[in-house]
Amino acid sequence: MSIKSDRWIKRMAEQHAMIEPFEPGQIKHDAAGQRIVSFGTSSYGYDVRCSREFKVFTNINSTIVDPKHFDPGSFVDIESDVCIIPPNSFALARTVEYFRIPRDTLVVCLGKSTYARCGIIVNVTPLEPEWEGHVTLEFSNTTPLPARIYANEGVAQMLFFQSDEVCETSYKDRGGKYQGQTGVTLPRT
């Protein structure tokens, strides 16, 4: 299994719609020329953006967090260019980009150092072979202060690993519960 380069990522995005919308370069400034957290194709990965759609966790109902019986009322929905995450809390978002993962490829997501150095951790499970959809992102604010996330700017890097053998059973074959997700998706069992 080897990590794939910018050339492979560009080819797969342009010829097979692996990433939509796709940015072949690295964007570091907005339309007004202001610096932003970069996004787009890097040497061996793709830096994704989060959309303006957020779900911020609040425990106003004093519920127990249970992945089998998750209470959607534990979140406040926000649509904004900026999301403020309360201290020691978390928020969910989704990528701007829609992914279609090839059958012989596994994608691993890592947070961007710009956020990590501020105590904001991004968590995403691997994108499995033949999974497709918008990626649901989880941002943990590990600090005792409110933390800010910017929509339409880079938040995480996707690394693409291509196997030397095609898997016997893909995520699509298994009927994965998050196949084709398009919004911020809460836990499913």
Swiss-Prot record:
Pathway: Pyrimidine metabolism; dUMP biosynthesis; dUMP from dCTP (dUTP route): step 1/2. One of its GO terms (biological process) is dUTP biosynthetic process. The keyword rRNA-binding does not apply. It holds the Pfam family DCD. It comes from the Bacteria. Homotrimer. DCTP binds at residues 112-117, 136-138, 157, 171, 181. The active site is at residue 138. Keywords: Hydrolase, Nucleotide metabolism, Nucleotide-binding. Catalyzes the deamination of dCTP to dUTP. It is an enzyme of class 3 (hydrolase). It catalyses: dCTP + H2O + H(+) = dUTP + NH4(+). The keyword Cell membrane does not apply. One of its GO terms (molecular function) is dCTP deaminase activity. PANTHER family: DCTP DEAMINASE. Its EC number is 3.5.4.13. Belongs to the dCTP deaminase family. InterPro entries: dCTP_deaminase (IPR011962), dUTPase-like_sf (IPR036157), dUTPase_trimeric (IPR033704). This is dCTP deaminase.
